[in-house]
């Protein structure tokens, strides 16, 4: 092979020498012999997502050449197709291949097969398997295992090769096989856009493959998929549960560049096929008649919204009681001790209601009230469950109440098959206290309330002025208007002296912070060179362990990725490292988990410190939970010196450095800066521009399209 490092992927063929590591997701590290017209590398390190491989397997692949600081040159697989024959067709090679890859064949039998048939054994197994009965030791039962094993491998090879022939990468092809099974190729040949049903593959990817194959731009399959994509994106990017029909049609036009008439037909077709749903509820008939358009949902979102409204109505309409129909909730005088009148009213509301909402801004005593509720419930002999959407928020809830709290997912017993606790097997609590409810979308709220036992109570705690949830829906806002709700308004003396809390309450009235306090200040920076300036400010404030950087966006000169690059360069410089989702991680780096990992008990948003980096493995300390991560697990990590404000929701730090500039204009809103500011306990410093804060303070968020409140009130 050439000693130079080509910038673009190139083609090679090769054979497997040794598989060193393989994860459940297909991420593999192996030693292989690679060759192309430029030469041969007899002991190449090859990494990436690959089909199941064993010693002796042959393949063709598209690879990128990289240089690792510790391990030297390695080849990263972009795409790979497994061949049907081993590289070594000698007697020893055939024997090794049969032993490793063909079911029912051990070392002795493999040697006999190789000696009897040599390289012809593969064709015979495919075309005339009965001849194997000539080999001593092969019975009808053994032959059946051999043929079944070979057929299964052949099917998988043909599937993967066929899918890659459609233009899919090996990673996409394996995902498709996992999702559709043996029907994967047939399904995608009939409609390539069914690829969008596969987790992690969206319309834009499928459309790129479609256009590369010369597919018609006005094909109904393409337009229907675009209509579904418009609704999916409305949920994931804007949190909408539905779109007015005209907005859905505009989405189709935007993503496909077809005419409005074709887009209208696409939405109609998607509804007829059941891939979208139009809400035909009498509740919205007058609106539809007046506007001439209905509300378009993804079917599962519409079902969830209706079911959630039904559950909430049941909780509001039924009295609290134990399994025998009794209720002994009483509020003695001592339970009110130290509480204001509005705080104590929460205890009284829980006497007669199963579902109560507690809201309020910083410094108003939500934590004190929550602890008082838990104390009273336990004094009455009730089982109390405490949870929050994220691990950090759960830890904070546990600290303020003096009890064990968990994530919502853990409390509900989340596993591969979903939640263990549901309406059939409710969670074993008489009272559920849920904090940071502003982070919960409709889907998670539905799972939570479905697991509430008959007669049990729920206290939902949150701040309606914070950022809305990442997921679709806005359940806290609806519940705060439909359920018994106590909004704490009194800011307590000690909190009132905190300039951060003063500024937070000012933001709610559209006022930008009054900078200039030693605990609340702003440094003007520009996007050009701004990330470097932020890194220097972090150093002045004591380094990454003493301050958390927050920013509205991931991308851009003042986005999370660029800030992390400069922060890592200043505080943990070096070359190489282990590849993660963005960049590389080295010992000493701060990282953040971006997905729940129940096997390792690491939850979305948890910060960790890299202790060790070896090969393609990282050892990370997540608040005392030391885990070794490898393969696809590494791509659930990002550098965590800087976080987005959304990622920081539910967390709190002593000192926060918030980056805010007009460069973040699409994201600037009152809820965003209020959430960023209230992540700081003691000191908040901003890098950016005062005018950006003024713009954000004056700008309310776009209303979300959700009908939850209307459905709750409809009965």
UniProtKB/Swiss-Prot annotation:
HAMAP family: RecD2
Functional pH dependence: Optimum pH is 6.3 to 6.5 for unwinding of a 56 bp substrate and DNA hairpin binding.
Region (Not required for helicase activity): 1-150
A GO term for molecular function: single-stranded DNA helicase activity
Catalytic activity: Couples ATP hydrolysis with the unwinding of duplex DNA at the replication fork by translocating in the 5'-3' direction. This creates two antiparallel DNA single strands (ssDNA). The leading ssDNA polymer is the template for DNA polymerase III holoenzyme which synthesizes a continuous strand; ATP + H2O = ADP + phosphate + H(+)
Record-given protein name: ATP-dependent RecD2 DNA helicase
Pfam families linked to this entry: AAA_30, HHH_5, HHH_RecD2, OB_YrrC, SH3_13, UvrD_C_2
Entry EC number(s): 5.6.2.3
GO term, biological process aspect, one: DNA recombination
Positions that bind ATP: 343, 363-367, 466, 493, 679
Subunit structure as annotated in this protein's UniProt entry: Monomer; homodimers seem to be inactive.
Class of the enzyme per the UniProt entry, highest EC level: isomerase
A cellular component annotation (GO) from this entry: exodeoxyribonuclease V complex
Role according to the record: DNA-dependent ATPase (ssDNA stimulates the ATPase better than dsDNA) and ATP-dependent 5'-3' DNA helicase. Plays a role in an antioxidant pathway. Involved in DNA damage repair and/or recombination. Appears to move along DNA in single base steps, powered by hydrolysis of 1 molecule of ATP. Has low processivity, unwinds about 15-20 base pairs/second. Short (20 bp) substrates with 5'-overhangs or forked ends are the best substrates, is much less efficient on 52 or 76 bp substrates with 5'-overhangs. The presence of single-stranded DNA-binding protein (SSB) increases unwinding 4-5 fold.
Outcome when changing residue 596 to A: Loss of helicase
Disruption-associated phenotype: No significant change in resistance to gamma radiation, slightly increased sensitivity to UV radiation but remarkably decreased resistance to H(2)O(2), 50% reduced catalase B activity. Normal growth in the absence of DNA damage, increased sensitivity to gamma irradiation, UV light and H(2)O(2), greater efficiency of transformation by exogenous homologous DNA. No change in sensitivity to mitomycin C (MMC) or methyl methanesulfonate (MMS).
Record bears the keyword Transcription: no
Other remarks in the entry: There are no RecB or RecC proteins in this organism. In B.anthracis it is involved in mismatch repair, in B.subtilis it is involved in replication fork progression.
